[in-house]
Amino acid sequence: MSNIITEITKSQLRTDLPAFRPGDTVKVHVKVVEGTRERIQLFEGVVIKRRGGGISETFTVRKISYGVGVERTFPVHTPKIANLEVVRRGKVRRAKLYYLRNLRGKAARIKEIR
């Protein structure tokens, strides 16, 4: 039984996404359905968390929109993600960057890996 589950989950995994980590600035191209139309919406921000493994793996992206922090969680292997671009590689020493929620302005910057 577990072999069947393993095979099904392996077929659902995506291999076309680039490697990214917490601290990286990414652009997520999300497919949005509005009525009968489908369009692509960009969501650019810093990856603050990556959790889980296999088919249930998720990541959270945080951005500031009009002075308000917005966080959005995406499953890594969802077909709703059309594309994912890594804009900048960030150098951080933590796996979960929850402390960024309390920082404002220049204090919330992350050093870039050269």
Swiss-Prot record:
Specify one Pfam family. Ribosomal_L19
Q: Which domain of life is it from?
A: Bacteria
Look up the record and report any one GO term of the cellular component aspect. Answer: cytosolic large ribosomal subunit
Keywords assigned by UniProt, alphabetized: Ribonucleoprotein, Ribosomal protein
Q: Give the GO molecular function terms.
A: structural constituent of ribosome
PROSITE patterns, per the entry: RIBOSOMAL_L19
Q: Which GO terms describe its biological process?
A: translation
Family named by the database record: Belongs to the bacterial ribosomal protein bL19 family.
NCBIfam families in alphabetical order: rplS_bact (TIGR01024)
**Function (record text):** This protein is located at the 30S-50S ribosomal subunit interface and may play a role in the structure and function of the aminoacyl-tRNA binding site.
- This one is known as Large ribosomal subunit protein bL19
**Which species expresses this protein natively?**
Lysinibacillus sphaericus (strain C3-41)
* Lineage start: Bacteria, Bacillati, Bacillota, Bacilli, Bacillales
